[in-house]
Amino acid sequence: MTVYTASVTAPVNIATLKYWGKRDTKLNLPTNSSISVTLSQDDLRTLTSAATAPEFERDTLWLNGEPHSIDNERTQNCLRDLRQLRKEMESKDASLPTLSQWKLHIVSENNFPTAAGLASSAAGFAALVSAIAKLYQLPQSTSEISRIARKGSGSACRSLFGGYVAWEMGKAEDGHDSMAVQIADSSDWPQMKACVLVVSDIKKDVSSTQGMQLTVATSELFKERIEHVVPKRFEVMRKAIVEKDFATFAKETMMDSNSFHATCLDSFPPIFYMNDTSKRIISWCHTINQFYGETIVAYTFDAGPNAVLYYLAENESKLFAFIYKLFGSVPGWDKKFTTEQLEAFNHQFESSNFTARELDLELQKDVARVILTQVGSGPQETNESLIDAKTGLPKE
Protein backbone atom coordinates (compact mmCIF):
# COMPACT_ATOMS: atom_id res chain seq x y z
CA MET A 1 0.00 0.00 0.00
CA THR A 2 1.34 3.40 -1.01
CA VAL A 3 0.43 6.03 1.56
CA TYR A 4 0.90 9.72 0.80
CA THR A 5 1.50 11.83 3.91
CA ALA A 6 2.24 15.39 5.00
CA SER A 7 2.66 16.92 8.45
CA VAL A 8 2.37 20.53 9.57
CA THR A 9 2.59 22.42 12.83
CA ALA A 10 0.36 25.47 13.26
CA PRO A 11 0.36 28.20 15.88
CA VAL A 12 -2.09 29.74 18.28
CA ASN A 13 -3.02 33.34 17.59
CA ILE A 14 -4.41 35.70 20.19
CA ALA A 15 -6.56 38.55 18.91
CA THR A 16 -5.71 42.05 20.01
CA LEU A 17 -8.71 43.38 18.09
CA LYS A 18 -11.42 40.82 18.69
CA TYR A 19 -13.58 38.91 16.21
CA TRP A 20 -17.00 38.50 17.75
CA GLY A 21 -20.14 37.99 15.69
CA LYS A 22 -20.99 36.46 12.33
CA ARG A 23 -22.97 37.88 9.45
CA ASP A 24 -23.07 34.42 7.86
CA THR A 25 -22.84 31.40 10.16
CA LYS A 26 -22.31 28.79 7.42
CA LEU A 27 -19.40 30.58 5.76
CA ASN A 28 -18.04 32.01 9.04
CA LEU A 29 -18.16 35.56 7.73
CA PRO A 30 -17.49 38.07 10.52
CA THR A 31 -19.30 41.25 11.43
CA ASN A 32 -15.98 43.05 11.83
CA SER A 33 -12.33 42.83 10.84
CA SER A 34 -9.84 41.70 13.49
CA ILE A 35 -6.13 41.71 14.30
CA SER A 36 -4.02 39.12 16.12
CA VAL A 37 -0.51 38.21 17.20
CA THR A 38 0.75 34.74 16.26
CA LEU A 39 2.49 33.05 19.18
CA SER A 40 5.62 30.91 18.99
CA GLN A 41 5.14 27.24 18.19
CA ASP A 42 7.97 26.40 20.56
CA ASP A 43 5.37 26.83 23.30
CA LEU A 44 1.88 26.50 21.77
CA ARG A 45 1.18 24.47 18.66
CA THR A 46 -0.98 21.90 16.98
CA LEU A 47 0.77 19.13 15.04
CA THR A 48 -1.36 17.54 12.32
CA SER A 49 -0.48 14.70 9.96
CA ALA A 50 -2.68 13.95 6.95
CA ALA A 51 -2.50 10.80 4.85
CA THR A 52 -4.35 9.37 1.89
CA ALA A 53 -4.34 6.08 -0.01
CA PRO A 54 -6.81 4.33 -2.34
CA GLU A 55 -7.25 1.58 0.26
CA PHE A 56 -8.62 3.90 2.97
CA GLU A 57 -12.31 3.17 3.55
CA ARG A 58 -13.49 6.40 5.15
CA ASP A 59 -12.34 9.82 6.25
CA THR A 60 -11.12 9.44 9.84
CA LEU A 61 -9.84 11.89 12.45
CA TRP A 62 -7.91 11.22 15.65
CA LEU A 63 -7.53 14.14 18.06
CA ASN A 64 -5.13 13.93 21.00
CA GLY A 65 -5.05 10.14 20.76
CA GLU A 66 -8.81 9.57 20.53
CA PRO A 67 -11.09 8.95 17.52
CA HIS A 68 -13.06 12.10 16.81
CA SER A 69 -16.07 12.84 14.62
CA ILE A 70 -15.19 14.23 11.22
CA ASP A 71 -18.81 14.59 10.12
CA ASN A 72 -19.44 18.09 11.44
CA GLU A 73 -20.29 20.66 8.80
CA ARG A 74 -17.27 22.88 9.37
CA THR A 75 -14.73 20.11 8.86
CA GLN A 76 -16.62 18.79 5.85
CA ASN A 77 -16.63 22.26 4.27
CA CYS A 78 -12.85 22.42 4.59
CA LEU A 79 -12.34 18.94 3.14
CA ARG A 80 -14.70 19.64 0.25
CA ASP A 81 -12.93 22.87 -0.73
CA LEU A 82 -9.46 21.32 -0.48
CA ARG A 83 -10.52 18.30 -2.55
CA GLN A 84 -12.04 20.59 -5.17
CA LEU A 85 -8.77 22.48 -5.58
CA ARG A 86 -6.86 19.21 -5.89
CA LYS A 87 -9.43 17.90 -8.38
CA GLU A 88 -8.90 20.96 -10.56
CA MET A 89 -5.16 20.23 -10.61
CA GLU A 90 -5.77 16.59 -11.53
CA SER A 91 -8.11 17.52 -14.37
CA LYS A 92 -5.33 19.62 -15.93
CA ASP A 93 -2.57 17.04 -15.45
CA ALA A 94 -3.44 13.38 -16.05
CA SER A 95 -0.09 12.26 -14.61
CA LEU A 96 -1.08 13.32 -11.09
CA PRO A 97 -2.35 10.63 -8.70
CA THR A 98 -6.06 11.14 -8.03
CA LEU A 99 -5.67 12.02 -4.35
CA SER A 100 -8.90 14.01 -4.41
CA GLN A 101 -10.88 10.78 -4.84
CA TRP A 102 -9.31 8.94 -1.90
CA LYS A 103 -10.27 9.05 1.76
CA LEU A 104 -8.18 10.88 4.34
CA HIS A 105 -6.70 9.87 7.67
CA ILE A 106 -5.96 12.88 9.87
CA VAL A 107 -4.13 12.73 13.21
CA SER A 108 -3.80 15.84 15.34
CA GLU A 109 -2.26 16.68 18.72
CA ASN A 110 -2.15 19.88 20.76
CA ASN A 111 0.55 20.64 23.31
CA PHE A 112 -1.94 22.73 25.32
CA PRO A 113 -5.44 22.13 26.77
CA THR A 114 -8.19 21.92 24.15
CA ALA A 115 -11.23 24.20 24.54
CA ALA A 116 -9.62 26.13 27.39
CA GLY A 117 -9.76 29.62 25.96
CA LEU A 118 -6.36 29.27 24.28
CA ALA A 119 -7.62 29.37 20.69
CA SER A 120 -7.22 25.62 20.21
CA SER A 121 -9.78 25.51 17.38
CA ALA A 122 -7.84 28.18 15.47
CA ALA A 123 -4.57 26.25 15.64
CA GLY A 124 -6.42 22.99 14.98
CA PHE A 125 -8.14 24.04 11.76
CA ALA A 126 -5.08 25.96 10.58
CA ALA A 127 -3.01 22.80 10.98
CA LEU A 128 -5.65 20.56 9.37
CA VAL A 129 -6.09 22.77 6.32
CA SER A 130 -2.35 23.43 5.95
CA ALA A 131 -1.48 19.72 6.23
CA ILE A 132 -3.98 18.70 3.56
CA ALA A 133 -2.93 21.62 1.34
CA LYS A 134 0.67 20.32 1.59
CA LEU A 135 -0.49 16.74 0.99
CA TYR A 136 -2.35 17.87 -2.14
CA GLN A 137 0.53 20.19 -3.17
CA LEU A 138 -1.92 23.04 -3.76
CA PRO A 139 -0.46 26.14 -5.46
CA GLN A 140 -2.81 28.68 -3.89
CA SER A 141 -1.45 31.58 -1.82
CA THR A 142 -1.56 31.57 1.96
CA SER A 143 -4.37 34.15 1.95
CA GLU A 144 -6.38 31.97 -0.44
CA ILE A 145 -5.89 28.91 1.77
CA SER A 146 -6.89 31.03 4.78
CA ARG A 147 -10.38 31.37 3.28
CA ILE A 148 -10.78 27.60 3.65
CA ALA A 149 -9.46 27.57 7.22
CA ARG A 150 -11.97 30.35 8.01
CA LYS A 151 -14.82 27.96 7.21
CA GLY A 152 -13.55 25.59 9.90
CA SER A 153 -13.01 28.21 12.59
CA GLY A 154 -13.15 31.91 11.89
CA SER A 155 -10.00 32.81 13.79
CA ALA A 156 -8.13 29.88 12.19
CA CYS A 157 -7.55 31.97 9.10
CA ARG A 158 -5.26 34.24 11.14
CA SER A 159 -3.12 31.24 12.21
CA LEU A 160 -2.10 30.75 8.57
CA PHE A 161 0.40 33.59 9.00
CA GLY A 162 3.11 34.38 11.49
CA GLY A 163 3.72 37.72 13.12
CA TYR A 164 0.92 40.26 13.15
CA VAL A 165 -2.16 39.37 11.15
CA ALA A 166 -5.39 41.01 10.02
CA TRP A 167 -8.54 39.12 9.11
CA GLU A 168 -10.26 41.43 6.67
CA MET A 169 -13.99 40.91 7.01
CA GLY A 170 -14.74 41.49 3.34
CA LYS A 171 -18.07 42.52 1.86
CA ALA A 172 -18.93 39.80 -0.67
CA GLU A 173 -21.82 37.48 0.15
CA ASP A 174 -19.85 34.42 -0.97
CA GLY A 175 -16.93 35.34 1.32
CA HIS A 176 -14.23 35.36 -1.35
CA ASP A 177 -12.79 38.61 0.04
CA SER A 178 -12.92 37.54 3.72
CA MET A 179 -9.39 36.32 4.37
CA ALA A 180 -6.24 36.79 6.41
CA VAL A 181 -3.38 39.07 5.40
CA GLN A 182 -0.10 39.69 7.18
CA ILE A 183 0.44 43.17 8.64
CA ALA A 184 4.03 42.51 9.68
CA ASP A 185 6.24 39.46 9.99
CA SER A 186 7.52 38.30 13.37
CA SER A 187 10.99 39.46 12.30
CA ASP A 188 9.69 43.01 11.77
CA TRP A 189 8.86 43.42 15.48
CA PRO A 190 10.55 40.45 17.18
CA GLN A 191 10.71 42.14 20.59
CA MET A 192 7.04 41.35 21.31
CA LYS A 193 6.66 38.75 24.06
CA ALA A 194 3.66 37.19 25.76
CA CYS A 195 2.88 35.66 29.12
CA VAL A 196 -0.25 33.52 29.32
CA LEU A 197 -1.74 33.20 32.79
CA VAL A 198 -3.85 30.04 32.74
CA VAL A 199 -6.64 30.69 35.21
CA SER A 200 -8.66 27.65 34.12
CA ASP A 201 -8.21 24.84 31.60
CA ILE A 202 -11.80 23.67 32.03
CA LYS A 203 -14.07 23.81 28.99
CA LYS A 204 -16.15 26.99 29.08
CA ASP A 205 -19.90 26.95 29.75
CA VAL A 206 -20.89 28.99 26.69
CA SER A 207 -19.01 28.20 23.47
CA SER A 208 -17.76 31.05 21.31
CA THR A 209 -20.20 30.08 18.55
CA GLN A 210 -23.18 30.22 20.90
CA GLY A 211 -21.95 33.33 22.66
CA MET A 212 -21.31 35.48 19.64
CA GLN A 213 -24.68 34.76 18.07
CA LEU A 214 -26.42 35.65 21.34
CA THR A 215 -24.49 38.92 21.35
CA VAL A 216 -25.40 39.68 17.73
CA ALA A 217 -29.07 39.04 18.47
CA THR A 218 -29.44 40.91 21.76
CA SER A 219 -26.70 43.48 22.45
CA GLU A 220 -27.28 47.14 21.60
CA LEU A 221 -23.68 47.88 22.55
CA PHE A 222 -22.51 45.38 19.94
CA LYS A 223 -23.98 47.48 17.12
CA GLU A 224 -21.99 50.51 18.26
CA ARG A 225 -18.87 48.33 18.46
CA ILE A 226 -18.97 46.95 14.92
CA GLU A 227 -20.15 50.16 13.24
CA HIS A 228 -17.90 52.71 14.94
CA VAL A 229 -15.45 51.36 17.53
CA VAL A 230 -13.77 48.54 15.61
CA PRO A 231 -13.26 50.23 12.20
CA LYS A 232 -11.44 53.16 13.85
CA ARG A 233 -9.43 50.92 16.19
CA PHE A 234 -8.44 48.61 13.32
CA GLU A 235 -6.58 51.42 11.56
CA VAL A 236 -5.00 52.76 14.76
CA MET A 237 -3.77 49.31 15.79
CA ARG A 238 -2.46 48.39 12.36
CA LYS A 239 -0.49 51.66 12.24
CA ALA A 240 0.87 51.02 15.75
CA ILE A 241 2.15 47.59 14.69
CA VAL A 242 3.83 48.91 11.54
CA GLU A 243 5.44 51.76 13.51
CA LYS A 244 6.29 49.49 16.49
CA ASP A 245 4.45 51.87 18.81
CA PHE A 246 3.93 49.68 21.88
CA ALA A 247 2.16 52.32 23.99
CA THR A 248 -0.59 52.72 21.40
CA PHE A 249 -0.72 49.01 20.63
CA ALA A 250 -1.07 48.22 24.34
CA LYS A 251 -3.76 50.81 25.02
CA GLU A 252 -5.87 49.74 22.03
CA THR A 253 -5.42 46.05 22.92
CA MET A 254 -6.64 46.55 26.49
CA MET A 255 -9.51 48.80 25.46
CA ASP A 256 -10.66 46.33 22.83
CA SER A 257 -10.59 43.44 25.29
CA ASN A 258 -12.74 45.53 27.62
CA SER A 259 -15.08 46.46 24.77
CA PHE A 260 -15.49 42.84 23.70
CA HIS A 261 -16.32 41.64 27.20
CA ALA A 262 -18.68 44.58 27.67
CA THR A 263 -20.73 43.36 24.70
CA CYS A 264 -20.80 39.88 26.25
CA LEU A 265 -22.12 41.39 29.48
CA ASP A 266 -24.61 43.45 27.45
CA SER A 267 -25.98 40.27 25.83
CA PHE A 268 -29.21 38.86 27.20
CA PRO A 269 -28.89 36.74 29.15
CA PRO A 270 -25.39 38.07 29.93
CA ILE A 271 -22.29 36.01 29.18
CA PHE A 272 -19.47 35.90 31.74
CA TYR A 273 -16.23 34.64 30.22
CA MET A 274 -13.94 36.36 32.71
CA ASN A 275 -14.03 35.49 36.40
CA ASP A 276 -12.94 37.36 39.54
CA THR A 277 -9.32 36.31 39.02
CA SER A 278 -9.41 37.74 35.49
CA LYS A 279 -10.66 41.07 36.82
CA ARG A 280 -7.94 41.19 39.46
CA ILE A 281 -5.29 40.56 36.80
CA ILE A 282 -6.66 43.56 34.88
CA SER A 283 -6.37 45.76 37.97
CA TRP A 284 -2.89 44.40 38.63
CA CYS A 285 -1.72 45.32 35.10
CA HIS A 286 -2.96 48.88 35.50
CA THR A 287 -1.21 49.10 38.88
CA ILE A 288 2.09 47.97 37.33
CA ASN A 289 1.82 50.50 34.49
CA GLN A 290 1.01 53.28 36.95
CA PHE A 291 3.93 52.26 39.16
CA TYR A 292 6.40 52.66 36.30
CA GLY A 293 4.72 55.73 34.84
CA GLU A 294 4.55 54.11 31.41
CA THR A 295 2.73 51.28 29.70
CA ILE A 296 4.95 48.20 29.91
CA VAL A 297 2.25 45.50 29.86
CA ALA A 298 -1.05 45.00 28.05
CA TYR A 299 -3.71 42.44 28.89
CA THR A 300 -6.23 40.79 26.63
CA PHE A 301 -8.83 38.09 27.30
CA ASP A 302 -10.48 35.92 24.67
CA ALA A 303 -13.74 34.08 25.38
CA GLY A 304 -12.47 32.64 28.66
CA PRO A 305 -10.81 33.63 31.94
CA ASN A 306 -7.18 33.20 30.85
CA ALA A 307 -5.07 36.34 30.51
CA VAL A 308 -2.57 36.99 27.76
CA LEU A 309 -0.09 39.71 28.69
CA TYR A 310 1.91 41.41 25.93
CA TYR A 311 5.15 43.21 26.68
CA LEU A 312 8.45 44.12 25.00
CA ALA A 313 11.70 42.27 25.67
CA GLU A 314 13.31 45.51 26.87
CA ASN A 315 10.81 45.68 29.75
CA GLU A 316 11.02 42.02 30.74
CA SER A 317 13.04 42.57 33.92
CA LYS A 318 10.69 45.35 35.07
CA LEU A 319 7.59 43.24 34.55
CA PHE A 320 8.96 39.92 35.77
CA ALA A 321 10.12 41.41 39.04
CA PHE A 322 6.41 41.27 39.84
CA ILE A 323 5.24 38.30 37.77
CA TYR A 324 7.87 35.99 39.24
CA LYS A 325 7.13 37.21 42.77
CA LEU A 326 3.47 36.35 42.23
CA PHE A 327 3.58 33.23 40.09
CA GLY A 328 7.08 31.80 40.55
CA SER A 329 5.68 28.76 42.36
CA VAL A 330 3.28 27.68 39.57
CA PRO A 331 4.37 25.45 36.64
CA GLY A 332 5.74 26.92 33.43
CA TRP A 333 9.14 28.41 34.30
CA ASP A 334 11.31 25.46 33.27
CA LYS A 335 14.29 26.45 31.09
CA LYS A 336 12.88 29.92 30.38
CA PHE A 337 15.25 31.85 32.64
CA THR A 338 18.57 31.12 34.31
CA THR A 339 18.86 30.94 38.09
CA GLU A 340 20.74 34.24 37.97
CA GLN A 341 17.89 35.92 36.06
CA LEU A 342 15.29 34.66 38.53
CA GLU A 343 17.39 35.90 41.44
CA ALA A 344 17.66 39.28 39.70
CA PHE A 345 13.86 39.43 39.41
CA ASN A 346 13.58 38.84 43.16
CA HIS A 347 16.19 41.49 43.90
CA GLN A 348 14.43 44.02 41.66
CA PHE A 349 11.14 43.41 43.45
CA GLU A 350 12.71 43.79 46.89
CA SER A 351 14.22 47.13 45.88
CA SER A 352 10.99 48.43 44.32
CA ASN A 353 9.29 49.38 47.61
CA PHE A 354 6.14 47.81 46.18
CA THR A 355 3.84 46.65 48.97
CA ALA A 356 2.34 43.17 49.26
CA ARG A 357 -1.10 44.78 49.29
CA GLU A 358 -0.44 46.47 45.95
CA LEU A 359 0.88 43.22 44.51
CA ASP A 360 -2.25 41.20 45.44
CA LEU A 361 -0.40 38.08 46.59
CA GLU A 362 -3.69 36.17 46.74
CA LEU A 363 -3.58 35.94 42.95
CA GLN A 364 -0.88 33.26 43.07
CA LYS A 365 -3.29 30.58 44.28
CA ASP A 366 -5.76 31.29 41.47
CA VAL A 367 -3.39 30.82 38.51
CA ALA A 368 -2.70 27.22 37.53
CA ARG A 369 0.13 27.76 35.06
CA VAL A 370 2.17 30.34 33.21
CA ILE A 371 3.10 29.99 29.55
CA LEU A 372 6.01 32.19 28.53
CA THR A 373 6.25 32.77 24.80
CA GLN A 374 6.71 35.38 22.08
CA VAL A 375 5.62 36.37 18.60
CA GLY A 376 6.23 33.51 16.18
CA SER A 377 5.91 32.08 12.69
CA GLY A 378 3.04 30.62 10.70
CA PRO A 379 2.46 26.93 9.86
CA GLN A 380 5.59 24.88 9.24
CA GLU A 381 5.93 21.63 7.32
CA THR A 382 7.69 19.03 9.45
CA ASN A 383 9.11 15.51 9.20
CA GLU A 384 7.62 14.75 12.62
CA SER A 385 4.68 12.56 11.60
CA LEU A 386 1.89 11.15 13.75
CA ILE A 387 0.98 8.59 11.07
CA ASP A 388 2.66 5.27 10.29
CA ALA A 389 3.56 5.57 6.60
CA LYS A 390 3.15 1.80 6.12
CA THR A 391 -0.34 1.43 7.57
CA GLY A 392 -1.76 4.96 7.34
CA LEU A 393 -2.86 4.66 10.97
CA PRO A 394 -1.79 6.68 14.02
CA LYS A 395 1.60 5.70 15.37
CA GLU A 396 1.47 3.68 18.57
UniProtKB/Swiss-Prot annotation:
Pathway(s) served: Isoprenoid biosynthesis; isopentenyl diphosphate biosynthesis via mevalonate pathway; isopentenyl diphosphate from (R)-mevalonate: step 3/3
Gene3D superfamilies per record: 3.30.230.10, GHMP kinase, C-terminal domain
Enzyme Commission identifier(s): 4.1.1.33
Catalytic activity: (R)-5-diphosphomevalonate + ATP = isopentenyl diphosphate + ADP + phosphate + CO2
Residues reported in the UniProt entry to bind (R)-5-diphosphomevalonate: Y19, W20, G21, K22, R74, S153, G154, S155, A156, C157, R158, T209
A GO cellular-component term linked to this record: cytosol
Keywords: ATP-binding, Lipid biosynthesis, Lipid metabolism, Lyase, Nucleotide-binding, Steroid biosynthesis, Steroid metabolism, Sterol biosynthesis, Sterol metabolism
Organism domain of life: Eukaryota
GO molecular function terms attached to this record: ATP binding; diphosphomevalonate decarboxylase activity
Record bears the keyword Lipid biosynthesis: yes
GO biological processes: ergosterol biosynthetic process; isopentenyl diphosphate biosynthetic process, mevalonate pathway; sterol biosynthetic process
Membrane-crossing segments per the record: none
PANTHER family: DIPHOSPHOMEVALONATE DECARBOXYLASE (PTHR10977:SF3)
Oligomeric form and interacting partners: Homodimer.
Record's miscellaneous remark: Present with 13700 molecules/cell in log phase SD medium.
Family from the record: Belongs to the diphosphomevalonate decarboxylase family.
Task of the protein: Diphosphomevalonate decarboxylase; part of the second module of ergosterol biosynthesis pathway that includes the middle steps of the pathway. MVD1/ERG19 converts diphosphomevalonate into isopentenyl diphosphate. The second module is carried out in the vacuole and involves the formation of farnesyl diphosphate, which is also an important intermediate in the biosynthesis of ubiquinone, dolichol, heme and prenylated proteins. Activity by the mevalonate kinase ERG12 first converts mevalonate into 5-phosphomevalonate.
UniProt-recorded name of the protein: Diphosphomevalonate decarboxylase
Originating organism: Saccharomyces cerevisiae (strain ATCC 204508 / S288c) (Baker's yeast)
Name of the coding gene: MVD1
